[in-house]
A protein has these predicted regions:
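Transmembrane-helix signature of polytopic, membrane-embedded enzymes
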Residues: 40, 128-151
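Transmembrane catalytic cores of multi-pass membrane glycosyltransferases
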Residues: 58, 70, 200-324, 358
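Membrane-interface transmembrane helices that cradle and orient dolichyl/undecaprenyl
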Residues: 171-185, 315-322
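Luminal/periplasmic acceptor-recognition loop/helix of membrane-associated glycosyltransferases
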Residues: 471-519
Length: 519
């Protein structure tokens, strides 16, 4: 018999010499090819969905800051751009991202920024697909991460958070694989040094690590009881955990602002909790998903998909519970990031990444439990038999999903995807048309114009800063880590008086400038 027509045999543990015929090598090669095509379809769709016109405002003050850092070889420690808070401390943990963004912009303008953003989001999804659900068919993993990709691309703006999403995916993948390869834990301190100097959400890495430590401790204590899986023999010992944990703490301090930088996430958490009522009605991304859904209904595909993904992840815990199995690590992760996601729209993306991981890992564990149960009985495990009918059904499923993903990717090129998602955007690698007030900012920056400006939109203030800062300053911009709540109130009151034609706005401005130390 020719070699290519031979069938392979696999021995089932506990069955002695019993052999089971499985799919021949030729069919397996076809299966691998279709699985690769499926992953390529997902990553292609993710990249194309990510390439939408740039419409975030914060990128302009990020770019200006990066340019100034490269020109002056110095980092900001006090405010560079406003006259109302000119003496305020500025803990700018974004400086790493800002340098990268400024260099990218210098090399290829907005087009290259959008392409790099798409590449980073696609990398995040790729890490998720390859790192989670080791026991799952490729079709299921791609299906789950397709949902995640829709959520991520719905908020695919050029900001430091796109780096945080990728770092979060790497961190989660490292923690998942560290039980069998504890040497991977040594990668975390260097990653933390990079993360803490790019975005304040480096704290996500600490949250994930804390959840993992609690899980390891409880599984060690349970020794296979209480529905907790036994620890693998290769799991890191206490000495390694203490050393890595200490290095992570030190890594958080390796930033230009030392302990202020390490503790800066607490400032953000205050806005998330104590000051939530104030900021949620003034800043769109601080709005809760429930409030946003109440405003627009079912018109946002990305929000609907985020809700479906969360419900599936939550249901997977219930399904796992029917097998008397609990994962403390995944449970704590899900609760922590669900809390963040329910609080603010801006947190939907990291919550989606965690939900995707939880869903894949929970289903993967269910598959493994079923295999163990079947292997302990007289029947050959269903997953190992793979009858031809099931195999070809799976092939058809993979081909169908690939075609759908390629079709949805193509729909973004025609504009249909934008109408479906409610965003209305078409594939583009430039700025959103008539979105930024570049010409007005340049006009107001001409010689003879005032060196201080009041920009009625603190988003557009970033555009003014990009063209005219830091020699010309604005009353307030979108850097809520610099501009205080009191400044925000003065800003709103001044704009209201100006709109009403009340000259009393000048008195308010004078009072604000006096409080800010500006003469």
């Amino acid at each position: 018999m020719p070699e290519q027509n031979k069938t392979k045999s696999r021995k089932i543990p506990g069955r002695g010499s019993t052999a089971v015929k499985v799919i021949d090598k030729d069919a397996q090669d076809h299966s691998a090819l279709e699985s690769r095509m499926l992953v390529v379809a997902l990553l292609t769709a993710t990249f194309i969905w990510s390439c939408s016109p740039m419409m975030g405002f914060d990128i302009w003050w990020h770019l200006k800051t990066g340019q100034l850092i490269l020109e002056q070889y110095t980092l900001p420690f006090v405010d560079w751009f406003t006259y109302s808070d000119s003496e305020a401390a500025w803990v700018d943990l974004h400086w790493g991202f800002q340098i990268l963004a400024a260099a990218t912009y210098a090399a290829g303008g907005v087009a290259l920024l959008v392409l790099v953003k798409g590449a980073l989001i696609t990398t995040t999804v790729a890490i998720g697909v390859f790192a989670t659900g080791s026991k799952l068919d490729c079709c299921i993993r791609v299906g789950v991460w397709s949902l995640v990709a829709v959520v991520l691309t719905g908020r695919g703006i050029v900001r430091p958070e796109i780096l945080s999403l990728m770092f979060l995916a790497v961190w989660l993948a490292t923690m998942l694989r560290s039980n069998r390869n504890p040497k991977l834990l040594w990668l975390l301190p260097p990653l933390m040094i990079v993360w803490v100097n790019c975005h304040a959400l480096f704290v996500f890495g600490l949250v994930v690590s804390g959840c993992w430590i609690v899980d390891v401790g409880l599984r060690q204590l349970a020794s296979g009881r209480w529905g907790l899986a036994r620890l693998e023999e290769e799991t890191a010992d206490a000495q390694q955990l203490i050393i890595v944990g200490s290095l992570l703490a030190i890594a958080c301090l390796i930033n230009p602002y030392f302990e202020e930088g390490a503790l800066f996430p607490l400032v953000l958490f205050r806005k998330l909790s104590i000051d939530e009522a104030f900021y949620s009605v003034r800043v769109d991304e601080f709005t809760s998903p429930a409030t946003f859904f109440g405003q627009i209904g079912v018109r946002s595909l990305h929000l609907n998909i985020a809700a479906i993904l969360w419900l599936l992840a939550a249901a997977s815990f219930l399904w796992l519970g029917t097998w008397c199995r609990i994962s403390v690590f995944r449970g704590l992760l899900f609760v922590a990031f669900s809390y963040l996601g329910f609080k603010m729209m801006r947190n939907l993306s990291p919550a989606a990444v965690v939900s995707g991981l939880v869903l894949c890992e929970n289903i993967s564990e269910l598959v493994q439990l079923r295999r163990v149960r079947d292997a302990s009985g007289n029947a050959v495990p269903a997953m190992d038999r793979q009858p031809a009918s099931n195999f070809f059904t799976q092939r058809r499923c993979e081909i169908a999903v690939s075609v759908i993903l390629f079709g949805l990717a193509a729909s973004h090129l025609t504009g249909h995807w934008g109408r479906l998602t409610g965003l209305g955007d078409q594939f583009a690698i430039g700025e959103k048309t008539a979105w930024y007030s570049h010409e007005a900012a340049k006009f107001a920056g001409q010689p003879g114009f005032p060196a201080r400006a009041i920009v009625a939109s603190f988003g557009q203030a970033a555009v003014y800063e990009f063209h005219n800062g830091p020699t010309r300053r604005v009353l307030m911009d979108g850097r809520l880590e610099v501009c205080t709540r009191e400044t925000f109130k003065f800003y709103e009151a001044i704009l209201l008086k100006m709109e009403q034609g009340d000259p009393a706005w000048q008195n308010l401005l004078g009072l604000l400038m006096h409080k800010g130390g500006c003469q």
